[in-house]
Protein backbone atom coordinates (compact mmCIF):
# COMPACT_ATOMS: atom_id res chain seq x y z
CA UNK A 1 0.00 0.00 0.00
CA UNK A 2 2.78 2.43 0.92
CA UNK A 3 4.57 1.78 -2.39
CA UNK A 4 1.39 2.63 -4.30
CA UNK A 5 0.94 5.80 -2.25
CA UNK A 6 4.55 6.80 -2.92
CA UNK A 7 4.11 6.26 -6.65
CA UNK A 8 0.89 8.30 -6.69
CA UNK A 9 2.56 11.13 -4.75
CA UNK A 10 5.49 11.15 -7.18
CA UNK A 11 3.14 11.48 -10.16
CA UNK A 12 1.31 14.31 -8.40
CA UNK A 13 4.65 15.98 -7.61
CA UNK A 14 5.64 15.86 -11.27
CA UNK A 15 2.31 17.37 -12.34
CA UNK A 16 2.73 20.16 -9.80
CA UNK A 17 6.30 20.80 -10.95
CA UNK A 18 5.12 21.17 -14.56
CA UNK A 19 2.36 23.54 -13.47
CA UNK A 20 4.78 25.75 -11.52
CA UNK A 21 7.19 25.84 -14.45
CA UNK A 22 4.38 26.88 -16.79
CA UNK A 23 3.44 29.84 -14.58
CA UNK A 24 6.87 31.48 -15.07
CA UNK A 25 6.76 33.08 -11.64
CA UNK A 26 9.19 35.91 -10.92
CA UNK A 27 11.45 35.58 -7.85
CA UNK A 28 11.73 38.29 -5.21
CA UNK A 29 14.22 41.15 -5.33
CA UNK A 30 17.76 40.28 -4.18
CA UNK A 31 18.47 40.39 -0.44
CA UNK A 32 21.46 39.37 1.72
CA UNK A 33 21.76 35.59 1.94
CA UNK A 34 21.01 34.34 5.48
CA UNK A 35 23.29 31.31 5.02
CA UNK A 36 26.35 32.34 2.98
CA UNK A 37 27.98 35.69 3.85
CA UNK A 38 28.61 38.01 0.94
CA UNK A 39 25.98 36.45 -1.30
CA UNK A 40 22.51 37.53 -2.31
CA UNK A 41 19.36 35.43 -2.22
CA UNK A 42 16.13 35.51 -4.18
CA UNK A 43 12.99 33.57 -3.33
CA UNK A 44 10.11 32.15 -5.31
CA UNK A 45 7.09 32.93 -3.14
CA UNK A 46 3.67 31.27 -3.24
CA UNK A 47 0.61 31.86 -1.11
CA UNK A 48 -1.85 29.04 -1.86
CA UNK A 49 -5.51 29.74 -1.21
CA UNK A 50 -5.59 26.54 0.84
CA UNK A 51 -2.51 24.76 2.15
CA UNK A 52 -3.33 21.15 3.01
CA UNK A 53 -1.02 18.48 4.43
CA UNK A 54 -0.94 16.55 1.15
CA UNK A 55 -0.25 19.58 -1.04
CA UNK A 56 2.45 20.86 1.30
CA UNK A 57 4.25 17.51 1.25
CA UNK A 58 4.35 17.73 -2.55
CA UNK A 59 5.74 21.26 -2.31
CA UNK A 60 8.44 20.16 0.15
CA UNK A 61 9.53 17.55 -2.38
CA UNK A 62 9.89 20.43 -4.85
CA UNK A 63 12.27 22.17 -2.38
CA UNK A 64 9.67 24.55 -0.90
CA UNK A 65 9.47 25.48 2.78
CA UNK A 66 6.62 27.06 4.72
CA UNK A 67 6.66 30.35 6.62
CA UNK A 68 3.35 31.68 7.90
CA UNK A 69 0.65 30.90 5.35
CA UNK A 70 3.05 31.08 2.42
CA UNK A 71 5.71 28.80 0.96
CA UNK A 72 9.04 29.74 -0.59
CA UNK A 73 11.90 28.22 -2.53
CA UNK A 74 15.33 29.72 -3.21
CA UNK A 75 15.70 31.01 -6.78
CA UNK A 76 19.11 32.66 -6.49
CA UNK A 77 21.15 33.87 -9.45
CA UNK A 78 24.03 31.49 -10.06
CA UNK A 79 23.57 29.48 -6.85
CA UNK A 80 21.73 26.23 -6.10
CA UNK A 81 23.18 25.40 -2.68
CA UNK A 82 19.90 25.14 -0.70
CA UNK A 83 18.62 21.57 -0.66
CA UNK A 84 16.04 19.98 1.61
CA UNK A 85 17.37 17.39 4.06
CA UNK A 86 15.21 14.67 5.58
CA UNK A 87 15.70 11.76 7.97
CA UNK A 88 14.41 8.22 7.61
CA UNK A 89 12.81 7.83 11.04
CA UNK A 90 13.03 4.05 11.31
CA UNK A 91 16.57 3.84 9.94
CA UNK A 92 17.98 6.55 12.22
CA UNK A 93 20.46 5.46 14.88
CA UNK A 94 21.79 8.06 17.35
CA UNK A 95 25.52 8.63 17.60
CA UNK A 96 27.37 8.50 20.91
CA UNK A 97 27.21 12.29 21.30
CA UNK A 98 23.49 12.30 20.47
CA UNK A 99 22.82 9.64 23.10
CA UNK A 100 24.80 11.76 25.56
CA UNK A 101 22.68 14.80 24.64
CA UNK A 102 19.51 12.81 25.32
CA UNK A 103 20.77 11.75 28.75
CA UNK A 104 21.86 15.31 29.57
CA UNK A 105 18.31 16.51 28.86
CA UNK A 106 16.47 13.72 30.65
CA UNK A 107 14.95 16.32 32.99
CA UNK A 108 13.34 18.25 30.11
CA UNK A 109 9.54 18.11 29.80
CA UNK A 110 8.03 18.63 26.34
CA UNK A 111 4.49 19.74 25.53
CA UNK A 112 2.99 19.51 22.05
CA UNK A 113 0.03 21.57 20.87
CA UNK A 114 -1.24 24.40 18.71
CA UNK A 115 1.13 27.37 18.28
CA UNK A 116 0.61 29.92 21.05
CA UNK A 117 2.69 33.13 21.03
CA UNK A 118 3.46 34.48 24.51
CA UNK A 119 5.68 37.21 25.91
CA UNK A 120 7.87 34.58 27.59
CA UNK A 121 8.53 32.81 24.29
CA UNK A 122 9.05 36.08 22.45
CA UNK A 123 11.73 37.11 24.94
CA UNK A 124 13.57 33.82 24.38
CA UNK A 125 13.17 34.19 20.60
CA UNK A 126 14.56 37.73 20.63
CA UNK A 127 17.53 36.75 22.83
CA UNK A 128 18.21 33.78 20.56
CA UNK A 129 18.37 36.05 17.51
CA UNK A 130 20.65 38.49 19.33
CA UNK A 131 23.02 35.66 20.23
CA UNK A 132 22.90 33.95 16.84
CA UNK A 133 22.65 36.96 14.50
CA UNK A 134 20.09 35.02 12.46
CA UNK A 135 20.09 36.73 9.07
CA UNK A 136 17.65 39.57 8.47
CA UNK A 137 15.15 38.57 11.18
CA UNK A 138 14.40 41.49 13.50
CA UNK A 139 12.99 39.76 16.57
CA UNK A 140 9.91 41.99 16.60
CA UNK A 141 6.61 40.81 18.08
CA UNK A 142 4.90 41.04 14.69
CA UNK A 143 7.55 38.85 13.09
CA UNK A 144 7.32 36.34 15.94
CA UNK A 145 3.52 36.19 16.01
CA UNK A 146 2.79 36.43 12.29
CA UNK A 147 5.49 34.39 10.59
CA UNK A 148 5.91 31.69 13.23
CA UNK A 149 2.51 31.37 14.87
CA UNK A 150 0.06 32.32 12.11
CA UNK A 151 -0.04 28.88 10.56
CA UNK A 152 -2.21 26.22 8.88
CA UNK A 153 -4.21 23.77 11.02
CA UNK A 154 -1.53 21.07 10.69
CA UNK A 155 1.11 23.24 12.41
CA UNK A 156 2.12 22.40 15.97
CA UNK A 157 4.39 23.89 18.61
CA UNK A 158 6.70 21.91 20.87
CA UNK A 159 7.77 23.65 24.08
CA UNK A 160 10.60 22.38 26.29
CA UNK A 161 10.93 23.22 29.97
CA UNK A 162 13.01 22.23 32.98
CA UNK A 163 10.66 22.68 35.89
CA UNK A 164 9.12 26.05 34.94
CA UNK A 165 12.04 27.46 32.98
CA UNK A 166 11.65 27.69 29.22
CA UNK A 167 14.49 25.88 27.46
CA UNK A 168 13.29 26.33 23.89
CA UNK A 169 10.36 26.05 21.51
CA UNK A 170 9.80 25.15 17.89
CA UNK A 171 7.15 25.16 15.20
CA UNK A 172 6.61 21.92 13.26
CA UNK A 173 4.22 20.81 10.53
CA UNK A 174 2.61 17.41 11.01
CA UNK A 175 1.40 15.37 8.05
CA UNK A 176 0.49 11.68 7.71
CA UNK A 177 3.73 10.86 5.86
CA UNK A 178 6.09 13.58 7.08
CA UNK A 179 6.89 15.95 9.90
CA UNK A 180 8.71 19.19 9.07
CA UNK A 181 10.74 21.29 11.51
CA UNK A 182 9.89 24.89 10.55
CA UNK A 183 11.86 26.90 13.13
CA UNK A 184 13.43 26.31 16.53
CA UNK A 185 14.83 28.78 19.06
CA UNK A 186 16.15 28.42 22.60
CA UNK A 187 17.46 30.27 25.63
CA UNK A 188 21.10 31.06 24.71
CA UNK A 189 22.08 30.70 28.38
CA UNK A 190 21.26 26.99 28.03
CA UNK A 191 23.27 26.38 24.87
CA UNK A 192 25.45 23.82 26.71
CA UNK A 193 22.45 21.49 26.69
CA UNK A 194 22.56 21.40 22.85
CA UNK A 195 18.84 22.19 22.62
CA UNK A 196 18.82 22.05 18.81
CA UNK A 197 20.12 18.48 18.80
CA UNK A 198 17.73 17.47 21.56
CA UNK A 199 14.82 18.98 19.63
CA UNK A 200 15.56 16.81 16.58
CA UNK A 201 15.91 13.70 18.77
CA UNK A 202 12.56 14.44 20.42
CA UNK A 203 10.88 15.01 17.05
CA UNK A 204 12.25 11.69 15.79
CA UNK A 205 10.72 9.97 18.81
CA UNK A 206 7.42 11.76 18.19
CA UNK A 207 7.47 10.63 14.55
CA UNK A 208 7.90 7.04 15.72
CA UNK A 209 4.99 7.37 18.14
CA UNK A 210 2.78 8.65 15.32
CA UNK A 211 4.01 6.24 12.65
CA UNK A 212 5.41 9.08 10.50
CA UNK A 213 8.24 7.82 8.25
CA UNK A 214 10.07 11.08 7.43
CA UNK A 215 11.36 14.07 9.38
CA UNK A 216 12.27 17.10 7.24
CA UNK A 217 14.90 19.41 8.77
CA UNK A 218 14.81 22.22 6.21
CA UNK A 219 17.63 23.34 3.96
CA UNK A 220 21.16 22.04 4.09
CA UNK A 221 23.76 24.47 2.73
CA UNK A 222 27.38 23.36 2.49
CA UNK A 223 29.37 25.93 4.46
CA UNK A 224 26.17 27.58 5.65
CA UNK A 225 26.07 29.17 9.08
CA UNK A 226 24.55 26.82 11.69
CA UNK A 227 23.87 24.03 9.18
CA UNK A 228 26.43 21.37 10.07
CA UNK A 229 24.38 19.78 12.87
CA UNK A 230 21.78 18.49 10.38
CA UNK A 231 24.16 16.13 8.61
CA UNK A 232 25.19 14.58 11.93
CA UNK A 233 21.84 12.77 11.96
CA UNK A 234 22.28 9.62 9.91
CA UNK A 235 21.21 8.21 7.60
CA UNK A 236 19.83 11.30 5.89
CA UNK A 237 18.73 12.12 2.38
CA UNK A 238 19.29 15.38 0.46
CA UNK A 239 17.03 16.53 -2.36
CA UNK A 240 19.03 16.96 -5.54
CA UNK A 241 18.50 19.65 -8.20
CA UNK A 242 16.84 16.95 -10.32
CA UNK A 243 14.17 16.37 -7.66
CA UNK A 244 15.58 13.00 -6.57
CA UNK A 245 16.31 12.18 -2.92
CA UNK A 246 19.77 10.69 -2.37
Feature annotation, model-predicted:
Residues 2-65, 69-91, 162, 169-188:
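Conserved donor-binding loop and adjoining core beta-sheet/short helix segment
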Residues 192-204:
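Conserved acetyl-CoA-binding loop-helix of GNAT-fold acetyltransferases
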Residues 74, 83-90, 214-246:
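Active-site/acyl-donor-binding loops of N-acyltransferases
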Residues 207:
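Hydrophobic pocket-lining residues that define ligand/cofactor binding sites across diverse proteins
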Residues 59, 125, 200-203, 230:
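Residue-level preference for non-acidic, small/hydrophobic
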Residues 67-78, 84-192, 232:
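A conserved beta-strand-loop-helix scaffold within acyl/acetyltransferase catalytic domains
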Amino acid sequence: VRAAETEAREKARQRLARLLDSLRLEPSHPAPCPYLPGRESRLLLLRPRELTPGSYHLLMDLNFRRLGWGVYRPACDGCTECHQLRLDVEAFRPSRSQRRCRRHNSDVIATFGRPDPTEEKHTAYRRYLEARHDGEMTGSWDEFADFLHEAPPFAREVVYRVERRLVGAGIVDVEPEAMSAVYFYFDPDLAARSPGTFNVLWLLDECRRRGIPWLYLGYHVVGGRGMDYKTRFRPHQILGPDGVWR
